[in-house]
Curated annotation (Swiss-Prot):
Chemotactic-signal transducers respond to changes in the concentration of attractants and repellents in the environment, transduce a signal from the outside to the inside of the cell, and facilitate sensory adaptation through the variation of the level of methylation. McpN is a chemoreceptor that recognizes specifically nitrate and mediates chemoattraction. Binds nitrate specifically and shows no affinity for other ligands such as nitrite. McpN-mediated taxis occurs only under nitrate starvation conditions. The chain crosses the membrane at residues 25-45, 175-195. Residues 46-174 are periplasmic. This is Methyl-accepting chemotaxis protein McpN. A motif (N-box) lies at residues 54-65. It is found in: Cell inner membrane. Disruption phenotype: Mutant does not show nitrate chemotaxis. Nitrate binds at R61. Ligand free ligand-binding domain (LBD) is present in a monomer-dimer equilibrium. Nitrate binding to the periplasmic LBD stabilizes the homodimer. Its main location: membrane.
Amino acid sequence: MNESVARVFDRILRGLGLKTLNAQFLLSYALMFGLAACASVALYLSMSISPETINVAGAQRMLSQKMAREALQLRLGAGDPKALAATIAQYERSAADLDAGNAERNVSRMGAPEIAAQRQKVAQIWGRYRAMLDQVAQPASQVDLRGFSQYSTELLGELNNLVSLMSARADSVQHTQMWIAFGCLLAILVLVVLGRQFGLAPLMRQLRGLEVALTEVGAANFTHALAAGHADNEIGRIVAGYERMRQDVSGLLANVKRSAAETDKDVAEALEQALGAGDQVARQHQDLDQVATAMNEMSATVAEVARHANHAAHSTRDAAALAHEGRRLVEHASSQTGALAEELEQTALALNTLHQHAGSVGQVLTVISSIAEQTNLLALNAAIEAARAGEAGRGFAVVADEVRSLANRTQQSTQEIQGLIEQLQDGANDAVAAMRGSASHAQSNLVEADSAAQALGRIVATVEELDGLNQQIATAAEEQSQVAQDIDRNITNVSGLSEQAHEGTAAVLSANQRVKEHMAGLRVVLGRFRT
């Protein structure tokens, strides 16, 4: 019921163009102020007829009787003419004050038609009565005392009527003004009650609804929607502002929750990939350890080849010296040639072993290159995932770039080692061919030992050629030994870089784990908000 009446009043006020609460309350205040002013004016007008006016009219009755008494006393010779004259003058002044009003005596003029007619009637009677007073006051004059008494009685009666009319008029005016003031005060009370019941009460209900909504917001509940009755008043604008704030914050929290869920998913994927990268780096580190061990063995083998090459060089020089001694030492030369053939065979076997080890190293380097490429791809994927994660993945992106850089350097070093191994294989192939040629010559020397004297010149030339070849073999072996040492150092460096990559991967795993814990805390905090 109250809501219906409140809506009716609201429609009426809005129909008058008073759409805002400020304008509506201003109208009610203006009405109450106008009614209060009207009540004040009515109360003032109720006091406009002074009681002194009624007193003056009543005093005229006593003055009329006093004048009659004083006139009769003068007629009997006992009165004072001055006293009668003073009484007459006082009566006439009172009559003039009643006719025109006298502010000094606080006498107001009552201009009601019936009162004016009664004053006119009293004035006519007073005119006749005044003439008879003068006659009665003279002892020697002939006066109709009965007529004088009748005029005195008539004047007194009309004065009584005048006083009654004036009193009734004063009471009527006073009652009318009092009723007007009472009506204004009653209207003010009605406005206050209506404003409280149908203005303030709906306003307070809306404010209480807003208070409940804001309390829900304070409790992290953004699902409580508000609907404004009118969007063009103060409460409507406040509710509209609250709704915009609620929807914006609710949308923001929903986006944050969605972003947190996606970030948590990305972090989980990055953590899984980092675990896989860590396993790859660990396997790469193991493979590099195996390569380093193989390179150490190859270095030892190359050193052995160098020693054999030097020994072969010494042998050929000895053979050349013995060849110059002559035929007498042919048999000894034959035995030396057999020994030389055996050494050459061993050298060929050693070079074959070197060639095989070089091939093994090439295979290991191929594995290293493949691992480096996989590491590079994993680092690139990690960098892409970190870029997707935004600010939360920046640290992981830095680590991923470092891992990718290490993988690139490992791949470059592996390619360089591969080139050196290929050179080593080419040199080993040449050496094997040379050794096989030398072995063939040695076998020929053994077969042709009987013709050593005739072929002594050719033997000397052959031995000199063997000496040159052995010098080349020794030089190549020394170079291969140096290359093997360089490869060993590079492999050691690669192993160190792999260790750093392994540590970096562990750091990335730790960072991802911390990010995952932070995201879990963020989910707990966001879970408090209902959107």
